[in-house]
Amino acid sequence: MSAASAATALSLTPGWLRSEAMLDAYGVTEATWREALKKQPHFAISESPAFVGRAVVALAQDPNVSRWNGQSVSSGQLARIYGFTDLDGSQPDAWRYLVEVQDAGKPADVTGYR
């Protein structure tokens, strides 16, 4: 197969996405999303839809994107590798946070995860 016809297949998952549905569920907007922390403190690790969009852009611009073929990657994982950030300048790593903090029953603290 020539490089012109090569394809890469991967799975990209966002972290805890601040989608319109999530914002509506908490009665907040993208501008006021931190107010939702009163109801769900772990929502502090959430990411904007732009963050996963930036992951797609980074993949599209990578001439070596085939290294991801057959893999499942997260927006937080790719942010560390490609260096992009969320709208607030952070790099939320929701999946690591969910395992190490939320699932472990620890209080909400995004230090080292955002």
Regions inferred by a protein language model and the residue ranges of each:
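Residue-level signal for well-ordered alpha-helical positions
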Residues: 24-25, 71
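C-terminal helical subdomain
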Residues: 11, 32-114
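Short, hinge-like loop/turn segments at secondary-structure boundaries
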Residues: 26-31
